[in-house]
């Protein structure tokens, strides 16, 4: 079985696992006036209970792990909030390693779930390195924000909703980031709707084609 088919089927399993714990978010039409015959929609994942799509992957992963297993992850905010919420719901012990300069609102949100926090000097990459090192001691199981099949499969559940909400969809534009979101959604959509195009979007590519709104 190829990787796209594997992820699509795993996302279907994840969908049943997390269905009652997430919001099936709506698609809103854009206010932009585009070429005639083109309809543009936005998937409102900001409506999720933790404010982002990350809750899908977090629940998909954590619900499969024994409650006796101590968990650790690294985050610049949204993944940490999602894992903290999921761990609170499932009764897991979770530690989140965050960059020292993480936003105050995200830090407070994570602590609000009773999660243990480690503030690490440097950026999110160094926070991830710290979390991996702590996991290597054997005390914790590490939860990657993006490089994990269960996480990717959870994010892929968005793909099923898109296909149901917007039948015969032509193109799907997905932010790339660490790759988990586009891998999950892309696998589901290409498996069930092979003619639909998947276009990855990154900040660097956007800035090459469009001037920044704010300097």
Residue ranges and their predicted role:
Residues 1-215:
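PLP-dependent amino-acid enzyme catalytic core
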């Amino acid at each position: 079985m190829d990787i796209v088919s594997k992820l699509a089927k795993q996302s279907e399993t994840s969908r049943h696992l997390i269905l009652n714990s997430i919001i099936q978010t709506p698609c809103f039409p854009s206010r932009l006036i585009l070429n005639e015959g083109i309809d543009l929609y936005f998937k409102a994942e900001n409506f999720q209970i933790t404010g982002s799509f990350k809750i899908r992957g977090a629940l998909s992963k954590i619900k499969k792990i024994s409650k006796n297993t101590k968990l650790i992850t690294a985050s610049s905010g949204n993944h940490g909030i999602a894992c903290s919420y999921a761990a609170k719901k499932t009764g897991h012990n979770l530690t989140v390693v965050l960059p020292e300069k993480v936003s105050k609102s995200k830090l407070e949100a994570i602590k609000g779930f009773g999660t243990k926090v480690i503030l690490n000097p440097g950026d999110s990459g160094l926070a991830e390195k710290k979390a991996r090192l702590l996991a290597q001691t054997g005390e914790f199981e590490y939860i990657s924000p993006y490089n994990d099949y269960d996480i990717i499969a959870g994010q892929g559940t968005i793909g099923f909703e898109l296909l149901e909400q917007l039948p015969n969809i032509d193109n799907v534009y997905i932010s790339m980031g660490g790759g988990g979101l586009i891998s999950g959604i892309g696998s589901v959509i290409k498996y069930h709707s092979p003619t639909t195009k998947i276009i990855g979007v990154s900040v660097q590519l956007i800035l090459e084609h469009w001037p920044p709104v704010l300097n």
